[in-house]
Amino acid sequence: MSEKIEGDGTDLTISANNLTIDAAADITLDADGADIKFADGGTDLLGFANSSSDVVIKPLVNAKDIIFHQYDGTSILEINDGAYAKFTAAAVAPEATLTDGATVSWNALTQQVAKVTLGGNRTLASASSGVTGEFISLLVIQDGTGSRTVTWNAAYEFASDTAPTLTTTANLGDLFVFRYNGSKWLEVGRNLALTLS
């Protein structure tokens, strides 16, 4: 196939076996029609669209998925046409260490899996930035002295409205799991007096 550039006064077509766009700085694709499409053999496959300044990425062939591969071709993430995401391996929220202090703050959006070592009797603030339906976990660890207590913010809801009594043994941990209902962090599980090493 020979290279050619064709224009009809409205549209421009560039044809070639291989086409390389090489810019010393940036490349900007600016589509006032709000859509940028990738096609294969004349069939649209993937689209990027502007929806009130939200970016929409979607396959343009019905009943097809968007699949992310790592370098060796292994599938890592599949955005399935059935409206779910499938991970080849676990999706992991790294454990965050909360800052110990008189009041312990916790961001549920960036610290979903958290731990704190108590250096005294503390108040646990309500986990901020919660999303309805979100699960979070907190490992509360006694320091080398032990017998530290926690006063829980009213946003944490426990069975029978009774807050738990922490383990008092030095260096042991208590693990709590909560689910957010839009206004309260509902406890869904706990394990007390855990040996951590």
Where are these regions (language model features)?
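Beta-strand-rich, repetitive solenoid scaffolds
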Residues: 1-24, 28-32, 36-41, 45-51, ...
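Solvent-exposed, conformationally flexible loop/turn segments
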Residues: 101, 169-173
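Extended extracellular/luminal ectodomain segments enriched in beta-structured repeat modules
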Residues: 131-133
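Conserved short histidine dyad/triad with adjacent acidic residue
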Residues: 120
